Amino acid sequence: MFTSEFDVEALGSEIADALELIPSKRRIFSRSVDDKSWSSRIETAMQAYASAQVSALQPWLTANAEDTAVVLLVDLSGSMGTRIVPIASELRRICEAFSEAGISMAMLGFTTVGWRGGQSRQKWFSAGSPSRPGRLCDLLHVTFKQFDQQIRDDDWQSMLHPGLLCENVDGEALLWAAAMLEVRSEAKKVLVVLSDGAPVDDSTLIENGARFLERHIRSVIAELESNRALRLGAIGIGFAVDGYYANSSQLTEPDALSEKLATLLATLTD
């Protein structure tokens, strides 16, 4: 990477404050009461949440209630678009089911602070634009639910903010999530990625070649899949992820997320 100086890591509820000093993000992350788009997304997600069913997860939750830690890592790229609304409603139910079962679980998300490289690209340009700079954007890593805590409204609602979805650097996000799991004391450590496409950050790819992020994510996946202390799998959101992950499934309807997750978790912990 060229620099990590401008990367942001925050709880969902902290995003607005964390980005307040960044002029390009200040307006779209305003918690204004007249933000109709955000309010509409929350309302729609709550309606879907009211009817969401996670009964398919119950057998796995019951069988793995002890000595298991799970991380769900959600791709928050711009291509997720309006699909994030039904996905978020399902994820809230899933988080609650894990908490009720007493299973340690965290839900994380990854995107970028903005588009076109942000402050990292500006710094690179000021430094004379050296060739092959490595990752050239400002990462945004968000914790929506912490281990051993219930999901909170303000953390969850931030997932639905229209200004959140930007670009996706999957490899570094995987390493971040895996590092959280590695320090857990549970015997079974499971990382499940929800992804709707290949890693993309235009600023990075323009300066390093079209396959730069692709090579990195494949290297990271190979490293994690060879780690016997961690079980890794992925669910593709309208996207086939089997070309990346040894254990995976594909989701075409958001309301089937708990079923897909239950099947994948059973495979990973069998």
Could you say what each language-model-derived stretch is?
Residues 1-270:
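Acidic, glycine-rich A-domain
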